[in-house]
């Protein structure tokens, strides 16, 4: 029965090597008592035919018959991998690694398969099955001492798997052209036995002459030594007709036949046993390796190299422990502290550690790496108390060239007021030309003779009507009867305001003549003249009206500063001596010469 099995096994291998995979499968599957090696060969043939389901079934049978056959686990993993069942493939790769038992390869040449199963190739296929998660497994494959024959290409492929740049490499199975071959011990014992029997038969014809001494047999019976027998020279012995008997051999040369035959047989048996014993030793299979003390777990993802972790003590309101991997990035470190203390690390917290009595803040990856390298395991988390922000300092007053800026602002305001007065009759005021002032100065007292201007401002003042428009409820009054010079002009509309009372007191104390105005219908065109006013009211009006400005038209409360002509200043420029600024009831500015009591619309 065993002979028929081996014969069919050899026939199937011959058919497979010639390319007839179907015939080889038919012959192997017809064997009734199949072994794990035969089932392995059938599984490889089914992989060759791309029938992965049947291949997995026969590899299962092979594993059931020999649970230590790592090649069957490996090829079953290849079948699962090529069939798209990556999870099962990863499990079988792990089983293959466990069957290697810490070795980097298994040489199956003694069992009839001329191949070495390498741990590096098993890890390579597992990294392919894991995809992007197999970078660490590919790194382990490159660190193995036993590498495939194409080691350089193998390392390049492993490096690409680590980088994740390419994951479509083909698997590395045991070559499908290699199969387990049957042992060649069926005819060897018979040949050895025939050789031993022929050697024994060749030595059998010399057995009858074994009773005579060896020296006599070699020399022959016709030439006995003359010196050996001292009685050969006597005539009585020579003349006798009785045959001569051979002399008795010496004890040193003689040997009895039974011991010689037994010794020869024993020597032949010892030689035959010595010649057979090497063959019997070669045919015996090697002893199986010892079983592992602890069964390794079988799971889809298992790594030989584990991540190194360190434990840190974090002090905030109490002490708590965290574990971080090595190496560790700053975001992972902060996230673990946040999860442990249930806080959010932001600008309100600071992380620090003590080194040589100095406190170093952990605000970058460099500081974190420094802490790990120095093996510091205590971290402090502190609240940051925000410092009070300083109050903004007021902007410096632009006092330089205040006189020139005021003159330019007064000229621009005069032009804007003139344009607004000329267009007030058409109900189209040009508000864009009105200077933007922020406060309204109060009329200064009449007793002052200096050129300084008061810094008091009326913050509750309301915006008056635009220049040239008629007030809503005007009241008319004429100048005082005690006024001298100037003559009477057109009536001036007045309304109740703090400046009116001051003006009345001033008119009572001294005689002030307000310069007359011409009717608006005959008002002349404005001229850019800076000459002193003439005697005629018309020329006085035409030369002085261009500098008239109404600061109350666009005045508004804005702290304690005013804007004149686009420049920020705390007070208006001073008026030259002996002139004083006054305002009419309609908020029109004019100038008073305190020495001559003459009034002007513009400074001469």
From Swiss-Prot:
Bias (Pro residues) occurs at 244-260
Other comment: Although it only shares low sequence similarity with members of the NCF2/NOXA1 family, it may ensure the same function as NCF2/p67-phox.
Q: Where is this region: Disordered?
A: 180-298, 383-581
How does gene deletion manifest? No visible phenotype.
Q: Where are the TPR repeats?
A: 36-69, 71-103
Annotated SUPFAM superfamilies: TPR-like, WW domain
Query: What GO annotations for molecular function exist for this entry?
Result: superoxide-generating NADPH oxidase activator activity
Spell out the Polar residues composition-biased ranges: 502-528
Q: Which keywords belong to this entry? A: Repeat, TPR repeat
State which gene encodes it.
ncfA
What name does the UniProt record give this protein? NADPH oxidase activator
Q: Which organism was this protein described from?
A: Dictyostelium discoideum
For this protein, the record's InterPro entries field holds: NCF2_NOXA1, PB1-like, TPR-like_helical_dom_sf, TPR_rpt, WW_dom, WW_dom_sf
The UniProt entry's GO biological process terms, in alphabetical order, are: superoxide metabolic process
Q: Which part of the chain is the PB1 domain? A: 309-384
Q: Where is the WW domain?
A: 573-604
Which stretches does UniProt call biased (Low complexity)? Answer: 194-215, 225-243, 261-284, 396-424, 435-453, 467-483, 529-570
């Amino acid at each position: 029965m065993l002979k028929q099995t081996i014969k069919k096994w050899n026939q199937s291998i011959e058919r497979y090597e010639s390319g007839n995979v179907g015939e080889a499968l038919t012959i192997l599957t017809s064997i009734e008592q199949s072994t794990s090696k035969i089932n392995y060969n059938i599984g490889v043939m089914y992989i060759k035919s791309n029938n992965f389901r049947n291949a997995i079934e026969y590899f299962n049978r092979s594993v059931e018959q020999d649970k230590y056959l790592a090649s069957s686990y490996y090829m079953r993993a290849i079948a699962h991998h090529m069939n798209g069942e990556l999870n099962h493939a990863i499990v079988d790769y792990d089983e293959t690694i466990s069957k290697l038992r810490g070795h980097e390869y298994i040489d199956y040449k003694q069992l009839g398969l001329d191949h070495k199963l390498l741990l590096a190739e098993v890890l390579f296929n597992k990294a392919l099955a894991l995809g992007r998660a197999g970078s660490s497994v590919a790194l382990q494959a490159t660190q193995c001492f036993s590498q495939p024959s194409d080691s350089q290409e193998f390392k390049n492929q492993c490096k690409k798997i680590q980088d994740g740049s390419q994951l479509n490499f083909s698997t590395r199975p045991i070559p499908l052209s290699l199969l387990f071959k049957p042992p060649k011990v069926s005819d060897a014992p018979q040949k050895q036995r025939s050789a031993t029997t022929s050697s024994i038969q060749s030595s059998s014809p010399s057995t009858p002459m074994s009773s005579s001494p060896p020296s006599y047999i070699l020399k022959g019976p016709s030439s006995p030594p003359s010196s050996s027998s001292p009685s050969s020279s006597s005539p009585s012995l020579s003349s006798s007709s009785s045959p001569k008997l051979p002399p008795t051999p010496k004890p040193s040369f003689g040997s009895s036949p039974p011991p010689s035959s037994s010794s020869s047989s024993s020597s032949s048996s010892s030689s035959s046993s010595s010649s057979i014993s090497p063959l019997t030793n070669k045919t015996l299979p090697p002893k199986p390796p010892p079983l592992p003390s602890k069964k390794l777990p079988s799971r889809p993802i298992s790594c030989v190299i584990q991540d190194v972790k360190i434990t840190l003590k974090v002090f905030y309101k109490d002490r708590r422990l965290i574990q971080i991997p090595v190496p560790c990035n700053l975001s992972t470190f902060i996230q673990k502290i946040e999860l442990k203390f249930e806080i959010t690390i932001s600008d309100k917290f600071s992380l620090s550690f003590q080194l040589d009595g100095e406190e170093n803040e952990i605000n970058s990856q460099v500081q974190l790496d420094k802490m790990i390298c120095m093996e510091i395991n205590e971290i402090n988390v502190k609240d940051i108390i925000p410092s009070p922000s300083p109050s903004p300092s007021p902007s410096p007053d632009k006092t330089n060239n205040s006189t020139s800026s005021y003159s330019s602002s007064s000229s621009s305001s005069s032009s804007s007021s003139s344009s607004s007065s000329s267009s007030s009759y058409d109900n189209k005021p040009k508000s864009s030309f009105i200077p933007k002032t922020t406060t309204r100065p109060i009329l200064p007292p009449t007793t002052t003779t200096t050129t300084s201007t008061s810094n008091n401002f009326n913050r509750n003042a309301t915006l008056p009507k635009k220049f040239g428009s008629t007030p809503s409820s005007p009241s008319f009054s004429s100048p005082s009867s005690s006024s001298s010079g100037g003559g009477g002009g057109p009536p001036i509309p007045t309304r109740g305001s703090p400046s009116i009372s001051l003006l009345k007191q001033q008119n009572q104390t001294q005689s002030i003549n307000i310069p007359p105005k011409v009717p608006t219908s005959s008002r002349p065109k404005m001229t850019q003249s800076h000459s002193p006013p003439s005697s005629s009211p018309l020329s006085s009006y035409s030369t002085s009206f261009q500098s008239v400005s109404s600061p109350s038209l666009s005045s508004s409360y804005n702290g304690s500063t005013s804007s004149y002509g686009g420049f920020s200043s705390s007070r208006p420029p001073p008026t030259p001596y002996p002139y004083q600024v006054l305002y009419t009831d309609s908020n029109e500015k004019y100038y008073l010469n305190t020495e001559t009591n003459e009034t002007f619309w513009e400074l001469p």
